[in-house]
Amino acid sequence: LKVCGKAIVFGMQESAGLRSSGHMRFFILFLCVASLHARDIRVGKDVLTIHQAIRVAEPGDTIHLEAITYCDYAGFYGKKGAPGKPITLDGHGAILEGSEALEPAKWTEVSPGLFKNDELLPRLDDAITCRWFFLFDGLMQRMGRTSKGKSAPYKRPDELQPGEWTFIKDPSREKPPSKQTFGTFYIRLAAGVKLADANIFYPVRSAGVQFGGDNAHLVIKNLTATHPYNDGFNIHGDCRDVVFENIRAIECGDDGISAHESAQYRVDGFVSIGNSTGICDTGTAQTSYRNIFLARNIGFDLYFLDEGRYAITNALVLSSAQNPFSTTGREKGDCRLALENVLFRRLVEPRVGVIALNSIVTGKRCTFEQLDLKITGSATWEKSVMNGKATATESSAVGADVQTLLKLTPPDFRP
């Protein structure tokens, strides 16, 4: 199937994908040779789905995707390679698409151009709806809302303009103590436009790449996550020796990438554009990022919390978020962030970054433009420049290597 000229491979349940006896025999044979040696597992050729490929992969194996768009996600739940023999997912430029086309038959026209749906997803809660968006003709419409930061109130249905949407909660359907919520989504089209012709997509997956449980010795590289209702790369649990290389998170409902609990990983090559938050790491996570580019994020650009240990080296941040930079720790333990060779360039009105209590930031060769910092925690700067002035008494403070960092800008990026 092709959508907008791109090849699409839809994820499917194993039970559906293996119904034919021929597929079943091949799949069993594939499992039998799994332990013989490191293999190349090609999704679409050797196995039908990304899920199947991850399930059968053993230490040393490489899962290969194609440079196409997959309406699917990559979930790692208790998956482990071995020291020196990681399991690798190589996207080869693949896109993991979190949205799907709206189904006109499931919507009711309540007045000319105004449509509603009472059960858009099987389950909703406030964490989902606060991240929600629709895509109208490929353009992301958040309605001024973001999961982290200030959000516009929902409009009344009669206030909607063409290309807008709203959500009206229905508390009468809720069943405490369940956090599940209910309500109705409304969308407005221009006069005379049929819903079937409107080219509207909505998010149906929570992430592009997701971790849960204990994972170890994994490499994920060369792929893009886009349009999930939560994070592009949603990393939960206790992971060790995990590497991400050349990854991108584009227009995700919440964070481009986010570490939770005690996750440990490193990233070399990351692009985060148009997300609610560029990077948000929490808990006792230990993460490092190298060669990263952030732009057009909404709520926060960089947000580091709790008792984690975090590092960023070689970063270009083109900031337009409500909250450009924030670190905050806990009373029982501090948050620590090390910055090196970072250019933080504010593109819109100046804002204040926050280094809050129980957080410690060290910066070496950093440049901040149009950004002041409110520091109630601890900050130490070396060879760094803040709004054209050295952050210390050093006469040799030249800041970040701007010309080199500007090369991190993706070739297809337009400010």
List where the protein language model places each region.
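Extracellular beta-rich repeat passengers
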Residues: 199-204, 215, 219-222, 227, ...
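Extreme N-terminal basic, low-complexity initiation segments
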Residues: 2-8
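Extracellular polysaccharide-degrading/modifying enzymes targeting complex plant/algal/animal polysaccharides
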Residues: 42-44, 48-227, 234, 403-414
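Serine residues within intrinsically disordered or low-complexity segments
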Residues: 15, 20-21
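Sec-dependent signal peptide recognition
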Residues: 23-29
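Hydrophobic h-region of N-terminal signal peptides that target proteins for export
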Residues: 29-38
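Short, positively charged and aromatic/hydrophobic N-terminal segments
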Residues: 8-9, 20
